[in-house]
């Protein structure tokens, strides 16, 4: 594992010595990927600090769930590894929840990002369903799964599925805190080698 800043500095130097366009493009992609990761780390730290200080603002309103899912389907369909299918399951297109649009996007994006990272083959499914007075969201994958020893700590700060895969270790902590601030809860079911299923709930808005 190479920290993002080290990679940015290192490949910025290497690109000046690159002789072919292919080599320059390869280094540019690495720099861009690690720059995005570093920006995400800064944003995660800022959001965590705001949540802990109880100063993060939420714009709570009724949200049509299918609109969020269609946006995320378009955003993530090309980010899966070769041959992996991203599938938005059949859902109630008229279902609403109460929450902050941007924060719900942030939560599901984090779960989908993890699923694409840890699913080298098979399928990733996501969607939602009604559960009493709540909407239950889910992201299910056929990836590497999570060792039992890590499940208990995965939503704690710096809890990671795999120490050798790049990531901030803050994303799932943020997901938990954001979900709880909007009146829900988050959990997972997983078995090593058999994929993972992440769930979270938010209040259901009856039309």
Question: Where in this protein do the model-derived segments appear?
Answer:
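Helix-loop junction within the histidine kinase core
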Residues: 49-60
